[in-house]
Amino acid sequence: MHALLLGIVLAQATPGVLALSPSNLTLNPAQQQNVAVSGATPPLQATLDRKLVTVAVAQDGRSVIVTATQATGSDVLHLVDGAGAQADLPIRVAFNAGTIVPQTTLTVTGNPADPAWLAARVTGWVTQLTKALPGAKVTIAPVTPPSSPLPPGTSAQFVVPVQIDGNGEYFDQSGTTSVNVQNLALEPFSPGLLFYDDDPEHLMQDGVLFRGTVTAAQPARLYYYHDDGLDPRKLVVALTSSSQDPTSVQLVDASAGPNMDVMHVGQTLTKNFLLTKARAEGVVVNLSQDEPYLLADVPMAARQLVSGTVDVRVLSGGPVVATVLSVSNGADPRTLLDGPILPGDGHHRTGAFKIDGFGTNALAYTAGGPDATLVVGDTDPTPPSVNPAAPGHDYGDYGVVHTIALSLNNPGAAPFTAYLYFKPLAGPARASFLIDGNLDDVGCVRVPTPYQVTSFNLAAGSTYRTVIQTMTDGASFYPAVIGITATPPQPGAPAISAPDGCFPKPQESPPPR
């Protein structure tokens, strides 16, 4: 009996535990949330460890309203009621790691649009739309390419999982972005203007590297080629328009890098752009007056190269200004847009050039006749400058697509094999050729001798015609000869360090006798 009475007395004397819902809080700065309190006997008292929030307690003790201040961190709210019952509420105040856009529309062009290209564009589009705070890490799940190309006038849907890791500083965010891809039917276009940007080649400070204006009447191509100096920085390509009219642009682009292997970057860019341009694969974006569109925003480490080619067509509104920027880590590209152009390095590999019709060539070869040859990338002819008084030049035809109408004729009574070859004249060079929709490339070659690109087997009495497209690879030395011959050329590029390779290894001297 005494034990029972003692238990009752102890139960009455021991304070109870309050029930809270939710049992912990995660708040953004200035965010407010109501917390329900069960089992409290008024009055309810509240104290805080750090005062990262403010607390308003209801008179009946059934709830508290917690409001975060602008400070971030962790706090604990201690509640005690009139009977001594207690509860602790852990609180964390932080910003969300970023913002995931739930749905969007991506307008593309392509005749048709290749599945792998589409998947890459969707990934890039979602990456660009996903905004993360400094120090947070964005992870875009791999996008599965569609089972078939996307024809003009059709659409496709993609659901892309996105994760933003707050790295302990922010609240992690996870979700999906639904992308409706629409393939807009547009006629292909060829720019008549080339913006050539390779001066200064090495990035040593922040600022504007190149600035050019594109109008609806004259599409333009931007070719940029830069490597980083000593400090990590970004290469940014921004498109802006001050027009009050809605401005829409079509962008057909490819890029390569960052990579320290400059010749690999140059050839990768050529191959990617030739294929992309042939399929008319691009994106259509709308520009706003108050926000630049970042076509490229590429982090670079010391000595890494980034290069790109983009054809720009203004579909409505405009004009559009294309600006290439060197931006140190942490700097806002928008603060540099209106600055002066950085001093050049003295090579004058920059400027605006007329390329309408430039690079249109023909090769005609008849079996049994002399070789047919064409020199590309020489100092004469070279794309003429828009401003004849400007010091810039484009020796090497960088950024120019050479389109070669090839005609082969075999009038004889026996089959015949003709060889397409590439012959460097100025030093190490690589080359890529788009022939009948397929890419053929030549590895790094240096010695001025013909190297085989491909061969053509001609039946007796037959004629063959096709169109070949090629571009000067960045980091390659031009001019070079493109030719057709009956004599089998060297079948492939030698090893890089071979005596006839691009960068021969010094030969050891023979031991003295």
Each language-model region and where it sits:
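Short, exposed coil/turn segments at beta-strand boundaries within extracellular/luminal domains
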Residues: D81-D88, N167-G175
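Extracellular/luminal low-complexity segments enriched in Ser/Thr/Pro
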Residues: R62-S74, V143-P152
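A short beta-strand micro-motif common to beta-rich folds, especially ectodomain repeats
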Residues: V37, T72-G84, A156-G166, V310
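Proline-enriched interdomain boundary motifs that mark the N-terminal boundary
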Residues: P15-S21, T99-P102
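Short glycine/proline-centered coil/turn motifs in the loop regions
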Residues: G39-P42, D49-K51
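Long compositionally biased, domain-poor regions of proteins
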Residues: N111-P112, Q128, A132, P145-P151, ...
